Amino acid sequence: MTKKLHIKTWGCQMNEYDSSKMADLLDATHGYQLTDVAEEADVLLLNTCSIREKAQEKVFHQLGRWRLLKEKNPDLIIGVGGCVASQEGEHIRQRAHYVDIIFGPQTLHRLPEMINSVRGDRSPVVDISFPEIEKFDRLPEPRAEGPTAFVSIMEGCNKYCTYCVVPYTRGEEVSRPSDDILFEIAQLAAQGVREVNLLGQNVNAWRGENYDGTTGTFADLLRLVAAIDGIDRIRFTTSHPIEFTDDIIEVYRDTPELVSFLHLPVQSGSDRVLNLMGRTHTALEYKAIIRKLRAARPDIQISSDFIVGFPGETSDDFEKTMKLIADVNFDMSYSFIFSARPGTPAADMVDDVPEEEKKQRLYILQERINQQAMAWSRRMLGSTQRILVEGTSRKNIMELSGRTENNRVVNFEGTPEMIGKFVDVEITDVYPNSLRGKVVRTEDEMGLRVAETPESVIARTRKENELGVGFYQP
């Protein structure tokens, strides 16, 4: 009988990436097949996020539902991973003694051994350590699911913003070696992936080892990824302004594979609040980065993150945030009301902004962002946009759907063989959450670099050291 695995994932794209790796790993080691139905599963895994308000209570609420399944099937294994697991550790079992496995973001590769241990002596396992880069060495080969893929290039963050739990739950910054990253992307390209999204909590701080022992920069890595045949679109998230150096901006000037869209969190437009947040940059420095980016890539669009109602934020501080939003002319952005995360310095600050005031500020900010995003969309009317076709449209299964460089969903009439390829589409209609268009050019008419396969690139550039060990030299 086929053994089944159910994974519920909350949080960021890094968590989505981690969950996909868990599924691949347990399929390779135990033959577990994914199921969307928790009641069918032999193993239930909850991959948690601690960023949002009441994250811990949300976890225990979900575990309470799974407890009923455990009572019906005592052999069911329940595991909790992610940032809440890293933060709470043994406390999870104190409140939910039926949980068998607690693991952190850096120990998910040990899941096969943890499951074997629980199956063997029924003893619970808790492993929330930080074994640095070992996780990536233990994961199976990547499996593509469509024309886009996430690739984690680093873990952790050293910035210690006062409101953020990431350095405590995922550890400090650790970068993967460049050849490991490039080989994973080449494997994905060989399976039909055309767009990669490079992931990290502070992705532009990547400083990975090169094949010759030197340390590469994020700008170096972007150019190496762009050189992989078959990869025609590169995204990355999430960035920190303090690490957004001029060499990265130069990549926007000369590397067309890098999309004309950037998510660069700023959180506030007030220097006083930025200082309280521990952001280590000013609003003016942020705007200087945007000015240089637009000089290098005039059509680039910027999205961001904002926190309203941070302790000590005055009406004047909020107005400075609104001015920054207008000055930069942000596109789609994420915004949240401040809520203290246990264990962070901000949790000890006096939360002195009334709740109703926080809600009002959030409403005003989101209305302005939505207006600007809609204006950006309207500018696209009548233009020709390059779309990576991801599959059938959610609105109409007789149509296709894909995304523009600036992350707009576009629905259009097409043929099945277009899926997984690029098409140029003229935008004919603009809606609040999507665009509509008609195909004006197929990939065969674009002259993209698909003549040389990733396998041939690897074979051509593979070298051996004096011990006969092969390595990939781009």
From Swiss-Prot:
Bound cofactor: record note: Binds 2 [4Fe-4S] clusters. One cluster is coordinated with 3 cysteines and an exchangeable S-adenosyl-L-methionine.
InterPro entries noted in UniProt: Elp3/MiaA/NifB-like_rSAM (IPR006638), Methylthiotransferase (IPR005839), Methylthiotransferase_CS (IPR020612), Methylthiotransferase_N (IPR013848), Methylthiotransferase_N_sf (IPR038135), MiaB_methiolase (IPR006463), rSAM (IPR007197), rSAM_horseshoe (IPR023404)
Annotated CDD domains: Radical_SAM (cd01335)
GO-annotated molecular function: 4 iron, 4 sulfur cluster binding; metal ion binding; N6-isopentenyladenosine methylthiotransferase activity
Record flagged with keyword Disulfide bond: no
Positions of the Radical SAM core domain: 143-375
Lipid biosynthesis in keyword set: no
EC numbers for this chain: 2.8.4.3
GO CC term (a single one): cytosol
PROSITE patterns: MTTASE_N, MTTASE_RADICAL, RADICAL_SAM, TRAM
Family designation: Belongs to the methylthiotransferase family. MiaB subfamily.
Task performed by this protein: Catalyzes the methylthiolation of N6-(dimethylallyl)adenosine (i(6)A), leading to the formation of 2-methylthio-N6-(dimethylallyl)adenosine (ms(2)i(6)A) at position 37 in tRNAs that read codons beginning with uridine.
Quaternary structure and partners: Monomer.
Stated name of the protein: tRNA-2-methylthio-N(6)-dimethylallyladenosine synthase
The organism of origin for this protein: Salmonella arizonae (strain ATCC BAA-731 / CDC346-86 / RSK2980)
Gene: miaB
